């Protein structure tokens, strides 16, 4: 999915508002995903998946850091996310549908925390951005 210049601006502005909360929002999105889509828990058998667990918080920060990297390299996401794509495709073997589920939960989390900034245009831009990230992460599955 191609991001327009307006989409890129919307994503960078919205992610800038996330700021220091990125790790917390990442963890909250993971918790939402585990509660809403319990089958996603199978990829984390070694995690304590209870609310507020240190492992979920740590992984939420990793998710947020990866998205921060993608925002910073929005014009070159395939190179910026190459190692992460390899990890998820070849080592972790995560079913690609899970990226869509996490993207949805992340959108819900952002909408809950940034209601004033989460306009229809920003929502659409973030959705396109997360779809692009998902596409990059699944590109090595082929």
Curated annotation (Swiss-Prot):
Q: For the modification Phosphothreonine, which residues carry it? A: 9, 109, 135, 138
Q: What residues does heme b bind to?
A: 88
- According to the UniProt entry, which residues carry Phosphoserine? 4, 36, 50, 103, 125, 132, 139
Q: Does the keyword Transport apply?
A: yes
Question: In which tissues is this gene expressed?
Answer: Red blood cells.
Sites where Phosphotyrosine occurs are at 25
The UniProt entry, under InterPro entries, shows: Globin, Globin-like_sf, Globin/Proto, Hemoglobin_a-typ, Hemoglobin_oxygen_transport, Hemoglobin_pi
| Gene Ontology cellular component terms for the protein in this record | blood microparticle; haptoglobin-hemoglobin complex; hemoglobin complex
Known Gene3D superfamilies for this protein?
Globins
Q: Which PROSITE patterns match?
A: GLOBIN
Query: Which GO biological process categories is it annotated with?
Result: hydrogen peroxide catabolic process
| Annotated residues for binding of O2 | 59
Looking up SUPFAM superfamilies in the UniProt record yields:
Globin-like
The record ties this protein, via CDD domains, to: Hb-alpha-like
**UniProt-recorded Gene Ontology molecular function terms:** haptoglobin binding; heme binding; iron ion binding; organic acid binding; oxygen binding; oxygen carrier activity; peroxidase activity
A single Pfam family, by name?
Answer: Globin
Q: Where is the Globin domain?
A: 2-142
In this UniProt entry, the residues modified to N6-acetyllysine are 17
Keyword list (alphabetical) reads:
Acetylation, Heme, Iron, Metal-binding, Oxygen transport, Phosphoprotein, Transport
Q: What is the role of this chain?
A: Involved in oxygen transport from the lung to the various peripheral tissues.
Family in the record: Belongs to the globin family.
By what name is this protein known? Hemoglobin subunit alpha
């Amino acid at each position: 999915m191609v991001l327009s210049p307006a989409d890129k601006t919307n994503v960078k502005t919205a992610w800038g508002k996330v700021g220091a909360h990125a790790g917390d929002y990442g963890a909250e999105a993971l918790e939402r995903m585990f509660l809403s889509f319990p089958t996603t828990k199978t990829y984390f058998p070694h995690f304590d998946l209870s609310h507020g667990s240190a492992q979920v918080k740590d992984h939420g920060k990793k998710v947020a850091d990866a998205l921060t990297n993608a925002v910073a390299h929005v014009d070159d996401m395939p190179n910026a996310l190459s190692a992460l794509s390899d990890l998820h495709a070849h080592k972790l073997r995560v079913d690609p549908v899970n990226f869509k589920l996490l993207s949805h939960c992340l959108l819900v989390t952002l909408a809950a925390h940034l209601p004033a900034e989460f306009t229809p245009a920003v929502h659409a831009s973030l959705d396109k951005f997360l779809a692009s990230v998902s596409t990059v992460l699944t590109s090595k599955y082929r």
